[in-house]
């Protein structure tokens, strides 16, 4: 692959805990400030906008582009899902049951958003009009974390404390699939073009592949302490991920070949990751910047 250029764009302060990032079709990047209690937008021309949230400590975390092209996000402490319009109009949807701590969120094939309830042992589904349904999981204390839409029409999720992943749809009951490593602690999950699921295993420093036949292949990274966190798939068949514990952005091909890109500042703490419409990779650094990785021609 071509060489990679990395460019940082300061969008917040370290104490605001920049966490999630998502791209919308207009080329904008939206991000969450978990301790800054705000959602931000980086426009294609580099302008930064902020949208304060009404809760004193809502803890916005994961963010995604919804079926309507707008950013949707979870507020773990406020027990809600939010949506923003480009002009800053905010809608908040409180979850039916208290203290559910919603975290991961992803758009589904059914035109709805699906989200994981870490403390509720449930998966939620919300229409773009705000109607919410919840589905109890058969595993208690599993800590459902991140979500992804599979090529099979199902929604897939990680169970961080259960060392497993699961699938669900509005018409299919949840199914649970244990991963190979007891200490996997899966967080991020993404689907590739072949229908396989890729999982970031923060506990043992590995990326796992779960194919359509249910086979699990584990790819150890350079260090068990790398703590891979979020995952995103690009159009070329690569999976990109943040290495929270190693201060790197990683890449793995569908064949399992890996590469890593060191971040410029020590202790950047990369978390969320997204691919923009031009194929550039963006990651959210807790130190307050979005970093863009883009291919450059070889010398």
Curated annotation (Swiss-Prot):
Keyword terms of this UniProt record: Antibiotic resistance, Lyase, Magnesium, Metal-binding
An example Gene Ontology biological process: response to antibiotic
Look up the EC number in the record and give it.
4.2.99.-
A Pfam match: Vgb_lyase
UniProt GO MF annotations: carbon-oxygen lyase activity; magnesium ion binding
- Binding residues for substrate: 229
Which residues are Mg(2+)-binding?
A: 269, 286
Annotated HAMAP family: VirginiamycinB_lyase
Which family does the entry's similarity section mention? Belongs to the Vgb family.
Q: What is this protein called?
A: Virginiamycin B lyase
Q: Which organism is this protein's natural source?
A: Bordetella pertussis (strain Tohama I / ATCC BAA-589 / NCTC 13251)
What is the name of the gene encoding this protein? Answer: vgb
């Amino acid at each position: 692959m071509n060489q990679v250029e990395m460019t940082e764009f300061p969008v917040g302060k370290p104490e605001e805990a920049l966490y999630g990032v998502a791209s919308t079709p207009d080329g904008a990047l939206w991000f969450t400030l978990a301790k800054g209690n705000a959602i931000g937008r980086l426009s294609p021309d580099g302008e930064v906008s902020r949208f304060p949230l009404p809760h004193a400590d809502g803890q916005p975390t994961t963010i995604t582009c919804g079926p309507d092209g707008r950013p949707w996000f979870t507020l773990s402490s406020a027990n809600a899902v939010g949506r923003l319009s480009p002009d800053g109009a905010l809608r908040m949807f409180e979850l039916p049951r208290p203290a559910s701590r919603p975290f991961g969120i992803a758009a589904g094939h059914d035109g709805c958003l699906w989200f994981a309830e870490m403390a509720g042992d449930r998966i939620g589904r919300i229409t773009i009009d705000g109607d919410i349904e919840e589905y109890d999981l058969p595993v208690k204390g599993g800590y459902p974390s991140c979500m992804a839409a599979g090529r099979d029409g199902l929604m897939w999720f990680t169970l961080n404390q259960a060392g497993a992943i699961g699938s669900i749809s509005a018409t299919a009951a949840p199914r649970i699939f244990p991963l190979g490593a007891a200490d996997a602690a899966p967080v991020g999950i993404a689907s590739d073009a072949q229908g396989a699921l890729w999982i970031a295993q923060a506990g043992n420093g590995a990326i796992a592949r779960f194919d359509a036949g249910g086979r699990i292949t584990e790819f150890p990274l350079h260090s068990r302490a790398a703590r891979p966190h979020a995952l995103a798939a690009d159009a070329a068949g690569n999976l990109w991920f943040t290495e929270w514990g190693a201060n790197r952005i990683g890449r793995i091909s569908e064949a399992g070949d890996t590469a890593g890109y060191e971040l410029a500042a020590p202790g950047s703490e990369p978390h969320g990751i997204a691919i923009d419409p031009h194929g550039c990779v963006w990651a959210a650094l807790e130190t307050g910047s979005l970093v863009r990785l883009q291919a450059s021609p070889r010398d």
